[in-house]
Amino acid sequence: MAGKSAREKIKLVSSAGTGHFYTTDKNKRNTPHKLEMKKYDPVVRKHVTYRETKLK
């Protein structure tokens, strides 16, 4: 049986307030801080900052 994974599923939410989000996973041992990256938001058709939130 596989052990508990170090990777955790997360949701990256757009800071533009459009409600658009991406889902991904990250290694919580290597990156304990919250991710923040620039990605394309198709609603506003621009690259904006996406911040990590918990995936429910």
Curated annotation (Swiss-Prot):
A single Gene Ontology CC term: cytosolic large ribosomal subunit
Signal peptide, first to last residue: none
Record-linked Pfam families: Ribosomal_L33 (PF00471)
Keywords noted in UniProt: Ribonucleoprotein, Ribosomal protein
GO biological process: translation
Family membership: Belongs to the bacterial ribosomal protein bL33 family.
PANTHER family: 54S RIBOSOMAL PROTEIN L39, MITOCHONDRIAL, LARGE RIBOSOMAL SUBUNIT PROTEIN BL33M
Protein name: Large ribosomal subunit protein bL33
Organism from which the protein derives: Halorhodospira halophila (strain DSM 244 / SL1)
